[in-house]
Amino acid sequence: MTVSIYSLFVIAVALALDAFGVSLSIGLSKNLRYKNKALFCISFGFFQFMLAYIGSYLGVLFNKYILVIPNIIGGIVIFVVGILMLKDGMKKDNKHMNIHKKMYFILGISVSIDAAIVGFTVLNSITSKLLLLESTIFIGIITSILCLIAFLISGYLKRINTISKYANYIGGVILMLFGLEMIFM
């Protein structure tokens, strides 16, 4: 079975919205370097691809056991990152957001857990390994592109003085709300 390019695009955009929101929030942080933005785009795209690919192989077997848990875990992680952004905003010398190498991995996985669910439920019907690889790579590329767009938008938003002054607070609150939405929806 195959998935139409239109359906795959809609799935890819829907999966990328978590990463888009997180990228937008992180992008509001003061003096975030281009290197950090690029690494987040790559991380989010890679984990969307990888978890969708792995999820398709695990398929129906784990679907009934893991369906609800990943959103809760991902939501908690994103909520905690929001709290950390608020904490960073309260520091007096807030010139740089503290980016740790672990953040690329942790956030990459937390925004991509839903890709594993899509793999379990939708992509596991694709029988060709090559087509499955192409489909999941497409999902990863769409995610990376949307994250890049989110970082570009956040760059324009930071130019507004009020947003720039309270960027960590705004980003932190957005992440916390987004995390709560993932947990309870």
From Swiss-Prot:
Enumerate the subcellular locations listed in this protein's record, separating them with semicolons.
Answer: Cell membrane
Organism superkingdom: Bacteria
Q: Which Pfam families match?
A: Mntp (PF02659)
**Molecular function terms in GO for this entry?**
manganese ion transmembrane transporter activity
Function, as annotated: Probably functions as a manganese efflux pump.
Which GO CC annotations does the UniProt entry carry?
plasma membrane
- The answer to whether the entry has keyword Cell membrane is yes
- Name the gene that codes for it: mntP
Alphabetized UniProt keyword annotations: Cell membrane, Ion transport, Manganese, Membrane, Transmembrane, Transmembrane helix, Transport
User: In this UniProt entry, which cysteines form S-S bonds?
Assistant: none
The record's listing under HAMAP family reads: MntP_pump (MF_01521)
Q: What protein name does the entry list?
A: Putative manganese efflux pump MntP
- How does the protein's chain sit in the membrane according to the entry? Multi-pass membrane protein
InterPro entries per UniProt: Mntp/YtaF, Put_MntP
- Membrane-crossing ranges are 8-28, 42-62, 66-86, 103-123, 137-157, 165-185
Family, similarity comment: Belongs to the MntP (TC 9.B.29) family.
